[in-house]
C-alpha cells in the first residue's frame, strides 16, 4: 500500500513528498527551498527569516474573515538514526516506508514523522480549497531536534497570529498545555595516550538491541541506557584489578536514550578469565533487571588487538565519573493535577572517543526552571571533579500552563463533540518550541497535539495511521469554529 492510498489521502500525499527530501537537523536547505516554492506556486505570501524558518500565510475563507489568526506550527528537520547493518545516507537518500497493519514504518531508519507528519498536515491545508478557516499562518521551523535553532532565532513579529497549534506531539487524544525546559551539558576529557603496560590483554565489550527512545517522553519507562551499562561494568572491574580504558563509544543524539555501545580496555593477562566470568554474571544480572522493559538485549565480549590506552589516572577518573553521573528520573511533579508527570531528569546521551580526548553529552530536563539549574549544576560538578572541561548550552524555557486559554477550551469541546469522549489535557516532560514562543510572544494562546507515534528517534519509529485522520478531523473542526 502506498502513502497515497492511506487516509486522509491529501496528508499522506504530502508526507510522501516530504520523505523524498533529505532534511537532517542543521541541513534543511532542500526542505526550505521546497517550502518556499510550495508557497509561491500556490500564490501565497511566503516569508523566510534569517534563521531559515518559513511562514506561509493563507487568507481566511469566506465568512471567517473576523476569526483570530491561527498559527499552525511544526519543525522541518528530523532525527537521523538507522540500524547498524543498514546502508543509508540521510543527506542524499529518500526515506523508504511500508505499512504493517495500522502502522506506517520506515525500512531500517527513523521514519521522519517527527515532525514530517505535522508539516504534511500544514501543507495539505495550504493546498486545499474546500476547508473553512480564518486567517492562517503555517510556520515551519528548522533544527528543532538538536538545538532549537529556528525557534531560538525567531524574532518577535515573524509570527503575527493570536493562537498557535503546535503539531509536534505524539499521542492522539492528548492535548498538551505545558512542557519542560531543558539544557545540554557537554564534557571534554583530555589526555595523552600511552602504550599499555607490558603483559596487558585487550578486550572489547558491547551491548546492543536496547529500545532507546526519546529522552523526555521515554525517560520514565525504565529502559536501559547503554552508556550506563558499560560504565557500570568498567567500574566493577576497575575496583578489582588494574584496568586501562582505550575507547568508549555510545550514543549519537542528546535527545535519545543510547541503544548500543562498545568499549575497548586492557587488563593484566592473568585477569582475562576473571573478566570473562564477571561479564557473564554481570550481563545475566542486567538481563534480570530489565527483563520487562528490555526483552531483547545482545551482549558481546571478545579479545582485540593491542591499542594505546589512557594514562592510569585519566582512565580511573573517567570511569569513576561515568559511574557517578546518574541517569533517569529524579523528581515527579508535585502539583496534584500533574503528579503523573516527570518533573526533573537527566539522560547520559553520548560518549565518543577521539585520539586524545573523550567527549560526553548529557541532557537535563525539568518543568521547574530552578530544578533544571540544580540538576545541570549537579552534572557539571561531577564532570569538573573528574577534570573535564565543561560547557552548558543556553537551553530552552519551560512552557507554563495558561488556565484561561480560549484555544484549549475550543480544542477540548471540539474533541468531545467529534469522538464522544474527553481528551486528556496535560503537560509533557519534553521540550516543545512552545516554551521559546512563550518568551517571545507572551500573549500567544497555545496548545499542542498530533497523531500517535511510537519509538521516535529510533529506527523503530512508527506512525499510527488511523490517528492521522482523527487529528485531521479535529484540527479542521477547531479552525471552523474559532
Predicted regions and their residues:
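Midchain, well-structured core segments that form catalytic/ion-binding scaffolds
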Residues: 22, 102-105, 145-146, 152-365
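Active-site-adjacent substrate-binding region
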Residues: 225-227, 232-248, 401-444
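Acidic/His- and Gly-rich active-site-bordering loop/insert found
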Residues: 2-102
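His/Asp/Glu-rich mid-to-C-terminal helical/loop segments that flank catalytic regions of hydrolases
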Residues: 222-240, 269-272, 316-326, 332, ...
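Substrate-recognition/cap regions that form aromatic- and gly/pro-loop-enriched pockets
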Residues: 341-430
